[in-house]
């Protein structure tokens, strides 16, 4: 037993050393990335300033600046620091550099004054000048003698971080709702209008994707206007340092909002875009996470949750980044001991700048999402659902379809990350567009209330290029899902279409709107089939990905089963369009369970014979639909 414990202790020690080494390596890589971005942004700011000096015409100076930067980008000196969206950040750098020059001139002036003062001898006490001269010792910088204390006071970051922050001045931060590959999401209150919002922060330090792609989600949100799509309010960019960022307040009662992206996932059901490690690069491609409790397609490391109704244990996984002080500092007799690697990393941290810029996206705050709702519902209901519940959930699904159809047809985009955690539920009124009745199952409340489902988290959205191939860039190809990599967790493979999973083995893939159709088919099945355990859910969702539905589900839902199998066909060309899904007859608005007053009045004026004829016609229409759908099921089973 002693030998076993000693052996285990040795293994733990080796593991700890390996973990520390990896942490230090990631820290250095992150620091190098920050230094490179810092330098490129400063160079770009200088170039813009020079171009403005060479030509007083603003339009011509902009063209000159763009041409020079584009040329430098081709040879690898710059990336996309010159894009219009980063003009405010470049302006901050220009102001900071101007301030630094003023500091340096003042330091030189004071240095010259000290030189003249020290040149005068003091006859009363000759020895007093030695400690003074030692304190004011000089060192050489490119042949110029500069006093250390003067040079040490010169800093670029002090000016950058002293600028007023719109976020700090205008918003009160309540809690961290979630964090992930495309940023962190916070629950905030605007001090001016008093309203509460979801604020997504994207820190450029952790982004290894191009700047233009960082702004893609913002531009997509800005042009969307639909009741079943999350609402966008504003966005802006600020320069920041670690010292100026607000402290993170993590609340276990936080609300689930659009992750975000991603943000992007995170809960006891299924994670979206959250918490990439330092080694995982962030691109606009799909990086898939496993579904907790699912027979994993792709392994992941940590998960997090910010759903207000998800079990509190899920919040324990929202860990802060590894603290190097904890992993590399030892104590012995109350004496702190630093190992060599940690001392080296401390030196690197001192020399590298920590400045970055943050993109703020102000969006609608939703206090619930479909994933959290399904968790609550499954505690109260079991399969099969009653007729009323089926109608409530099909009405809900119809509104979800409307939102995704708007994304496809209204703004010509493909979401690529449709799943329950990215479908948000906002409280609404019966007369609001896109609202449906639903039982919340909050606090044992079984009363119906009106909610509006909203599609959110557009961090993985892409343009729908009809009849064209979407070529994957080198960056995308090298950061698509790695089945052996446990650090990749953007997106969830459970709901992802097969062609997305196949993208890792091909440089060209035809990404169409049918990607979202597949994901919606998975969501429909989950809406109509309550699960009692995560294992049951995992097994049946994976079976559906293979084209199999439970026999008891098919018996209860013949038409719905056909629709689900149609939507989740492996071949995207065999999947229906969302318009075909809406017109198939299964998602007709409910006119029986919650009719409008006008409908009740008009119905009362119909005679009995007319009502019977309407019922018989509807019955015949449904029989014909069942026959068609059965033939489709047989066709799918014989493939």
Curated annotation (Swiss-Prot):
UniProt-listed Enzyme Commission number(s): 2.7.11.1
GO MF annotation terms: ATP binding; eukaryotic translation initiation factor 2alpha kinase activity; protein serine kinase activity
Transmembrane segments: none
Active site: 417
EC top class named in words: transferase
Keyword line: ATP-binding, Kinase, Nucleotide-binding, Phosphoprotein, Protein synthesis inhibitor, Serine/threonine-protein kinase, Transferase
UniProt region (Disordered), positions on chain: 298-322
Pfam families listed in its UniProt record: HRI2_3H, Pkinase
SUPFAM superfamilies associated with the record: Protein kinase-like (PK-like) (SSF56112)
Annotated Protein kinase domain residues: 171-588
Post-translational modification: Autophosphorylated.
Annotated InterPro entries: CC_SR_Kinase, HRI2_3H, Kinase-like_dom_sf, Prot_kinase_dom, Protein_kinase_ATP_BS, Ser/Thr_kinase_AS
Low complexity biased stretches: 298-320
Binding, ATP: 177-185, 200
Alphabetized CDD domains for the sequence: STKc_EIF2AK
Disulfide bonds: none
Reaction catalysis annotation: L-seryl-[protein] + ATP = O-phospho-L-seryl-[protein] + ADP + H(+); L-threonyl-[protein] + ATP = O-phospho-L-threonyl-[protein] + ADP + H(+)
Summary of the function given for this chain in its UniProt record: Mediates down-regulation of protein synthesis in response to stress conditions by the phosphorylation of the alpha subunit of eIF-2 (tif211) on 'Ser-52'. Protein synthesis is inhibited at the level of initiation. Activity is inhibited in the presence of heme.
UniProt similarity note: Belongs to the protein kinase superfamily. Ser/Thr protein kinase family. GCN2 subfamily.
Protein name: Eukaryotic translation initiation factor 2-alpha kinase 2
Gene symbol of the encoding locus: hri2
